[in-house]
Amino acid sequence: MTKTLVFGHKNPDTDTICSAISYAELKKAQGADIEAVRLGELNSETAFVLDYFQVTAPRLVQTVANEVSEVALVDHNERQQSVDDIDDVTVTAVVDHHRIANFETSDPLYYRAEPVGCTTTILLKMFRENEVEVSKTVAGLMLSAIISDTLLFQSPTCTEEDKVAAQKLAQIADVEIQSYGMEMLKAGADVSKKTVAELLLDAKEFNMNDNKVEIAQINVVDVNDVLSRRAEVEALMTQNIVDKGLDLYLFVITNILTNDSVGIAIGSKTAVVEEAYGVKFVENQAPLKGVVSRKKQVVPILTDTFAK
């Protein structure tokens, strides 16, 4: 039997890690030889989740072609967000809830993408369709992913399907959603001990009309906890622009209590962000009122503006 590795995107978040583990558990129950791995360090929110449910973190890998010939992707599809040697392996399956971009294969594959708030919402359907029982632990992980990606159902990406899935998973995991959810989000929003690199850890790269754009996001309970370190943050953003040849680096600092954000933009195309949101950046900073979702309120808007 051919072994498969399953993983989410670089700079993994809670959905990426929990989806990889959950997908692996589903496939193992069906007799597959599969292992969940990760492409980066855990953030503090995900570390809290794994500790809470007493789950070992997936193994960290830099490359995959040296181990396997087949992989499955969760929570992403875009090539630049995936493992560096993705072109050297065969992608046999994708389960995702993002746009499809910069992705093609030479062979047919299982591809499932749905416009929901979280990958594990789709995975719960797959467990049920295949009549595989969701364990208490895996239910806790899947619930945590939904809470994370939907900001406890406050994000505009959240659908009724996500809410229904969360209720079902909470019953299996024996977790009270609101109290656990706030505890989990606050664990991720504590930036007091984070390095500057860790503040920018949740970053994704996109190709927008032949422009290289990186968008990082962090959730906080007070944006000033990050803005007080703006000089250090901007220095690292600038270095990333040089190292990666980026046209734009946008850092979205989201207050999970007010559901507003502040943006820091650096690069040759910052005017695109100003046009997209009708704001003016002063010392690289501007308010982004009501913006909480990179997937729904940042990526598509910037993509459309770059295309003008």
Swiss-Prot record:
Give UniProt keywords alphabetically.
Cytoplasm, Hydrolase, Manganese, Metal-binding
Entries under InterPro entries matching the protein: DDH_dom, DHH_sf, DHHA2, DHHA2_dom_sf, Mn-dep_inorganic_PyrPase
Could you tell me what the cofactor note in this record states?
Binds 2 manganese ions per subunit.
Which GO cellular component term is one of those annotated?
cytoplasm
Where is this protein localized, as stated in its record? Cytoplasm
MF annotations from Gene Ontology = inorganic diphosphate phosphatase activity; manganese ion binding
| Enzyme Commission code | 3.6.1.1
Q: Where does Mn(2+) 2 bind?
A: D15, D75, H97, D149
Q: What is its main location?
A: cytoplasm
User: Which reaction is recorded as catalysed by this protein?
Assistant: diphosphate + H2O = 2 phosphate + H(+)
Name the enzyme's class.
Answer: hydrolase
Please tell me where Mn(2+) 1 binds in this chain.
H9, D13, D75
CC cofactor: Mn(2+)
Kindly name one Pfam family recorded for this protein. Answer: DHH
NCBIfam families from the UniProt entry: PRK05427.1
To which protein family does this belong?
A: Belongs to the PPase class C family.
Q: What is this protein called?
A: Probable manganese-dependent inorganic pyrophosphatase
Provide the species name.
Answer: Listeria monocytogenes serotype 4a (strain HCC23)
